């Protein structure tokens, strides 16, 4: 298959995935929209779903479907099993939406996926916290509706619950490493950074979609899952470091969001790299300007990053990490096809959004 054909297949898969969303909304809302007691709340759920779940890249959700199709022999891929794979893909997207709505509140973000954050919309505010919980609840309603009779139902429930917990642990590490109003650069070590990334991003963004497809394909052995986890945690770190780079150096018209890591006092890959390279004078500049909302102070930190040429440091890291990832896939992917992991790595390598 040449590049254009691959693109056509990918675009078709993406369209099929997006089209399934209307079915998801229908299952979650249709029966109760006219309910005499709950009707108004169900209308709100529909609005929350339609604003917060669509508009992303759908990489996580599509990974479930693509991996399922690669692991399950074609004769077993009937319409019903593909519906279930699409639904579980949307459950991953719902989990992502749940985290993002809350994350945007905690980070005081303004835009997400090219539109104003949900909590920033007039009349929403902190009610968005409850809306996020509705998104999380939708996951388990869908799993029950579509997968309850399947042998992998319990494994999927545990996987989603575990992924939520790991992500919340990661968010906790992130928040306590950089408490609001307290800048303590001594906390920003490479070790702490890797822990935050492992728990906050890698589990739900990389392991969850692949592991869900594995369970749906009947692959539930500990060794197979441990090997997949090893590769996918490494990939998750690679992805988050790209994200940290794009937060500052990305183009908001491409990324769909304006980065706030410097003013939010985040333990970002860039600040960790800056601290590893800074002279005492440069560290002083960082101490005086990091974690503050003043645009001039943010600009000083950015200038310091430019002075230390952190762009080049990132490009070298991206190259080295990609090569390391490829050799890890070679060693650990069996008995799964290496292509599952390689396609995912290629999708994020040199991404700019």
UniProtKB/Swiss-Prot annotation:
Pathway: Isoprenoid biosynthesis; farnesyl diphosphate biosynthesis; farnesyl diphosphate from geranyl diphosphate and isopentenyl diphosphate: step 1/1; Isoprenoid biosynthesis; geranyl diphosphate biosynthesis; geranyl diphosphate from dimethylallyl diphosphate and isopentenyl diphosphate: step 1/1. Mg(2+) 1 binds at residues 103, 107. Dimethylallyl diphosphate binds at residues 112, 200-201, 240, 257, 266. Binds 2 Mg(2+) ions per subunit. Inactivated by interferon-induced RSAD2. This inactivation may result of disruption of lipid rafts at the plasma membrane, and thus have an antiviral effect since many enveloped viruses need lipid rafts to bud efficiently out of the cell. GO terms for molecular function: (2E,6E)-farnesyl diphosphate synthase activity; dimethylallyltranstransferase activity; metal ion binding. The record marks 98-99 as: Important for determining product chain length. Keywords: Acetylation, Cholesterol biosynthesis, Cholesterol metabolism, Cytoplasm, Hydroxylation, Isoprene biosynthesis, Lipid biosynthesis, Lipid metabolism, Magnesium, Metal-binding, Steroid biosynthesis, Steroid metabolism, Sterol biosynthesis, Sterol metabolism, Transferase. Mg(2+) 2 binds at residues 103, 107. One of its GO terms (biological process) is spermatogenesis. Belongs to the FPP/GGPP synthase family. This is Farnesyl pyrophosphate synthase. It comes from Rattus norvegicus. The gene is Fdps.
